[in-house]
């Protein structure tokens, strides 16, 4: 992505995030943005919106479908993007808003990868430790299973990783034996 595009994305996302914080609607916007992001990624919408061959009005109609199920603040934001013919940047702006909102509120989605599914009790005990060790607040937990870890888990949030898997420990032992 070129610098000009990044500047355009920031032009929309920065004021929107500031407005969300002023209005105190972080929880609702986090929820709305996360749901839209999941739908957009599953449907391959970013590539559709970036296609030059697709008419601008079709792109605007497509992103307008999201307006019915989100907060009024986000409805207006989507409308501004459509009005300014920025539907092609919809996904990029959405992701940037989510990232900026996470940084501003220090509330992040945490990904926990383990060899076996964690119980609710394990998650409950783990969350305060994650918040303390990573100096952040857990907004949501995304759980992944990776049997190659053998045991233990890997925690990822805010570009930080805590790896206490048996796979990692074996790797360290192997390196020390060289």
Curated annotation (Swiss-Prot):
SUPFAM superfamilies: N-terminal domain of the delta subunit of the F1F0-ATP synthase
A single GO cellular-component term on record: plasma membrane
Compartment list: Cell membrane
Major location category of this protein: membrane
GO molecular function terms attached to this record: proton-transporting ATP synthase activity, rotational mechanism
Gene3D superfamilies the record matches: N-terminal domain of the delta subunit of the F1F0-ATP synthase (1.10.520.20)
Topology class, membrane: Peripheral membrane protein
Entry-linked InterPro entries: ATP_synth_OSCP/delta_N_sf, ATPase_OSCP/dsu
GO biological process: proton motive force-driven ATP synthesis
Induction, per UniProt: Induced by a decrease in external pH from 7.5 to 5.7.
Membership in a protein family: Belongs to the ATPase delta chain family.
Subunit structure: F-type ATPases have 2 components, F(1) - the catalytic core - and F(0) - the membrane proton channel. F(1) has five subunits: alpha(3), beta(3), gamma(1), delta(1), epsilon(1). F(0) has three main subunits: a(1), b(2) and c(10-14). The alpha and beta chains form an alternating ring which encloses part of the gamma chain. F(1) is attached to F(0) by a central stalk formed by the gamma and epsilon chains, while a peripheral stalk is formed by the delta and b chains.
Stated role: F(1)F(0) ATP synthase produces ATP from ADP in the presence of a proton or sodium gradient. F-type ATPases consist of two structural domains, F(1) containing the extramembraneous catalytic core and F(0) containing the membrane proton channel, linked together by a central stalk and a peripheral stalk. During catalysis, ATP synthesis in the catalytic domain of F(1) is coupled via a rotary mechanism of the central stalk subunits to proton translocation. This protein is part of the stalk that links CF(0) to CF(1). It either transmits conformational changes from CF(0) to CF(1) or is implicated in proton conduction.
Classification via HAMAP family: ATP_synth_delta_bact
Protein name: ATP synthase subunit delta
């Amino acid at each position: 992505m070129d610098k000009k595009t990044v500047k355009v994305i920031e032009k929309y996302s920065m004021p929107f995030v500031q407005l969300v914080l002023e209005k105190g609607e972080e929880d609702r916007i986090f929820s709305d943005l996360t749901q839209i992001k999941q739908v957009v990624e599953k449907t391959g919408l970013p590539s559709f919106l970036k296609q030059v061959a697709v008419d601008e009005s079709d792109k605007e109609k497509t992103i307008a479908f999201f307006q019915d199920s989100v907060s009024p603040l986000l409805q207006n934001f989507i409308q501004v993007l459509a009005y300014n013919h920025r539907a092609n940047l919809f996904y990029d702006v959405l992701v940037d808003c989510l990232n900026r909102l996470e940084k501003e509120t220090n509330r992040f989605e945490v990904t926990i990868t383990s060899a076996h599914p964690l119980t609710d009790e394990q998650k409950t005990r783990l969350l305060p430790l994650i918040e303390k060790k990573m100096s952040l607040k857990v907004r949501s937990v995304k759980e992944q299973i990776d049997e190659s870890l053998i045991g233990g888990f890997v925690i990822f949030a805010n570009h930080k990783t805590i790896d206490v898997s048996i796979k990692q420990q074996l790797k360290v032992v192997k390196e020390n034996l060289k």
